[in-house]
Amino acid sequence: MSCLEPLKKQKLLVIQSKIHSMKYSTTEFLKTATNTAEHFGFRKVEGFKNEPLCKNCSTTLSHTITPEDISQNTHNGLLSSYIATFCDNNLHALNAPVLLYSTEQIADTQDISIAFNIFNVQKSIAEAILIQMSRSLLQDLGHTDHTVRINSLGDNESATRYSRELANFLKKRLDSMSSNARESMKEHPLKALLELIKEDHDLSYRCPNPLEYLSDQSRKHFREIVEYLDMTETPYEIDPKMVNNFDCYSDALFSIEDKNFADNEASNLSIQGGRYDDFIFNKTKNRIPAVGTIITLKGINKPLTRIPRNKKSEPDVYVVQLGFGPKIRSLMIIDELRRAGIPVHHDLASDSLSAQIREAEARGVRYTIIVGQKEFIDQTVILRDMKERNQENIRPDQMLKKLKKQLALA
């Protein structure tokens, strides 16, 4: 992990999953994706419209996004669409984490796109949620053998410094570059790098490493994402050449690739994502933390006539955590509860134990699962019965059995 030594500031992730065969229908894909999203706490915009803070909001959040921006069949266009949805529906008034998902069919290609966005969460737990949810979705779709590739371009300060060094490096070697790469240099050095990577040019292996130019904040953020991967025993590799969609995203980038994928085969399923704090600032002139994942099912070639709706059951469990390690452990518990068919509430972005307990009480859940630093070290949880007002320290596997029995899910 020596390449982690020279890191530095913020969060840009890019997930790109290459899946070599589609073994499920469009309906199965959407049903699985929406079930997974809603378990992790994501809602459609309709689920926010009746929120009093949104309905009664008197302060609008203006933006410069046009219909032409949204119509672009690019990451730029898709992200613009999500920002417009956030602003136009007064979701900024919530002043709290907003986990939003949406489904659409791309007009030009008929591909099905489902997007997951997390607003108002600056911490790396937002990226961890998106990575974990994406991996869970892939596993549910039958793609269990995959690896995470990760990189970071850092925040604006980091990216500017890296772009300058990259430009200086390439300008000294223009004679050895192809005409396409030289032409791309006129627009942006990272665009030239993407062309060199596409050509598998020797320079693409010798270019400056973006991880060496990260600010302190970006280095810390990137390390936290890597810690999450280590703690969850997720196979991963650090790839400094992964600079996709640099014009949209900032900070940590990652991809998830099926190990069985052959380079000469077409991919049916694409998963791409990233943090776009700077992008949203350019559109709104407001500092709003934002991370998103776009999952696209390709090769549909027919209109989507029906988007399946899930039958929702009100969760009777709330997961409470305090601390970085407990957040990651809680994320894994939430995923285990998903596999067991137990719906759950959570606020993984919260750093207040009392606020989470109050929220659990307000929601009227029967059980809270509490993971603090002691429980994290001891590899236990506190299972609290909110009705009987008693609690016990218990191993996660025992907790799962008890919940299934008490909630009649065994």
Model feature map: region roles:
Residues S2-A410:
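TRNA-recognition modules of translation machinery and tRNA-sensing kinases, especially anticodon-binding
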